């Protein structure tokens, strides 16, 4: 026996322990470490994906807000254009109505002038006829001043 207490059993146990550690390292620790590294990578990828999702969500929210603003602006523009077109149509209709009214008034005035001239011609003819009749009556009989005045008054009354 050795004074240190190293014997063959201890060496065999030591070699067996080293082989066991080598086998555990090769078949257990390596795959376990790989599984842990894969899990760590998956967790990191998941966190990165969550962060990207957050950023994409913020970007989508920003785009949605921008689209809503653009839609409101477009709606306001459409409303303004519709109001402007409505004013234009109203003014155009008023202008056409004014032109039509002016045309009708001018036509009515022309018709009134024609009717007035026709009435004047008729009256002129009647006055001439009355004067001729009155003159014939005066010439056919002798009249005194009173009869003359009566005839003139009757002629004026007929006018």
UniProtKB/Swiss-Prot annotation:
User: Quaternary structure?
Assistant: F-type ATPases have 2 components, F(1) - the catalytic core - and F(0) - the membrane proton channel. F(1) has five subunits: alpha(3), beta(3), gamma(1), delta(1), epsilon(1). F(0) has three main subunits: a(1), b(2) and c(10-14). The alpha and beta chains form an alternating ring which encloses part of the gamma chain. F(1) is attached to F(0) by a central stalk formed by the gamma and epsilon chains, while a peripheral stalk is formed by the delta and b chains.
Is Transport found in the keyword set?
Answer: yes
Q: What does this chain do?
A: F(1)F(0) ATP synthase produces ATP from ADP in the presence of a proton or sodium gradient. F-type ATPases consist of two structural domains, F(1) containing the extramembraneous catalytic core and F(0) containing the membrane proton channel, linked together by a central stalk and a peripheral stalk. During catalysis, ATP synthesis in the catalytic domain of F(1) is coupled via a rotary mechanism of the central stalk subunits to proton translocation.
Name the lineage: Bacteria, Pseudomonadati, Pseudomonadota, Acidithiobacillia, Acidithiobacillales
Q: Which NCBIfam families match?
A: ATP_synt_b, PRK05759.1-2
Entries under Pfam families matching the protein: ATP-synt_B
Q: What is this protein called?
A: ATP synthase subunit b
Q: Where in the cell is it found?
A: Cell inner membrane
Q: What is one GO cellular-component annotation here?
A: plasma membrane
The UniProt family comment states: Belongs to the ATPase B chain family.
The GO terms this record gives for MF are: proton-transporting ATP synthase activity, rotational mechanism; proton-transporting ATPase activity, rotational mechanism
| Keyword Calcium (UniProt) | no
Give the encoding gene's name: atpF
